[in-house]
A protein has these predicted regions:
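PRPP-associated nucleotide enzymes
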Residues: 1-133
Length: 133
């Protein structure tokens, strides 16, 4: 299934010069969403890791079914001050500003799939899909 046709592109959102990839059109289509999760599951099944990390907020949508499919724990990477226990923070820059992600310190000593390893396993036609998450 060509998943890119289920993702809407919105120019100049949330500000001028940004091309926003709207995944709501993918997740509202049960067949496309299932196919997307199944494709990601196949890719992740080939990698060595301990947990699935869901990055707020789009990542939560995909990490939960992936965690279930692959029988792996799901850890949350959240915006600053959203996690209740002791946290580790990382600041980074986006196309339109700065942000901070946090993870519970007791989740740090785990192997999670890196973006580079996942991208190497994705076929060319769906590579842009992964970049939306």
């Amino acid at each position: 299934m060509e998943l890119s046709k289920y993702i809407r592109s919105i120019h100049d959102y949330p500000k001028k010069g940004i091309l926003f990839r709207d995944i709501t059109t993918l997740i509202k289509n049960k067949d496309a969403f299932k196919n997307c999760v199944d494709q990601m599951s196949k890719i992740l099944n080939k990698l060595n890791y301990d947990k699935i990390a869901g990055i707020e907020s789009r990542g939560f949508i995909f990490a939960s079914p992936l965690s279930y499919n692959l029988s792996k724990p799901h850890i949350l990477m959240r915006k600053k001050n959203k996690l209740p226990a002791e946290r580790h923070s990382v600041d980074f820059e986006l196309e339109y500003g700065k942000a901070t992600l946090e993870i519970h310190k007791d989740s740090i000593k785990t192997k999670i799939p890196s973006e580079d390893k996942v991208k190497k396993k994705i076929d060319e036609k769906n590579r842009n899909i992964y970049s939306c998450f």
